[in-house]
């Protein structure tokens, strides 16, 4: 099982994503979130086909297709976190922390 926690920026919402290999080609997803928009996405996004999500263009993934429908703004980082959890659970990439850090001017 792979689990990630996301705290979004300005909206201050939190989401926990649990990815668990359900068979050789699929990962099951479970979400706990404070965001009503991500909850709507989670209600539909129960399982992902690993090969399909990793082989199509970004906007053709099931994650971003549903994000386009439910997420409140384009800069939401939760869809990227879902794909990261999928990659780790499928043993495509090792788990590694990701960050977005805003720097002060001149740094």
Describe the predicted segments one by one:
Residues 80-107:
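C-terminal charged interaction modules
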Residues 4, 17-19, 63, 99-106:
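Generic preference for hydrophobic/aromatic residues in regular secondary structure cores
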Residues 1-30:
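Basic/polar, acidic-poor N-terminal "presequence/leader" segments
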Residues 23-83, 93-94:
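Active-site- and interface-proximal helix/loop "cap" or "latch" segments in soluble metabolic
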Residues 2-3, 11-13, 55, 59-64, ...:
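Aromatic-enriched hydrophobic runs in primary sequence
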Residues 10, 35, 86:
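Glycine-rich beta-alpha junction loops
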């Amino acid at each position: 099982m792979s689990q990630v926690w996301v705290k979004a920026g300005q909206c201050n919402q939190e989401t926990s994503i649990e990815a668990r290999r359900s068979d050789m080609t699929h990962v099951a997803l479970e979400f706990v979130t404070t965001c009503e928009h991500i909850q709507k996405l989670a209600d539909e996004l129960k399982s992902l086909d690993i090969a399909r999500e990793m082989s199509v263009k970004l906007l053709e993934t099931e994650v971003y297709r549903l994000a386009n429908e439910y997420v409140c703004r384009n800069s939401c980082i939760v869809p990227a976190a879902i794909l990261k959890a999928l990659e780790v659970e499928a043993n495509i990439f090792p788990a590694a922390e990701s960050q977005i850090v805003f720097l002060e001017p001149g740094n």
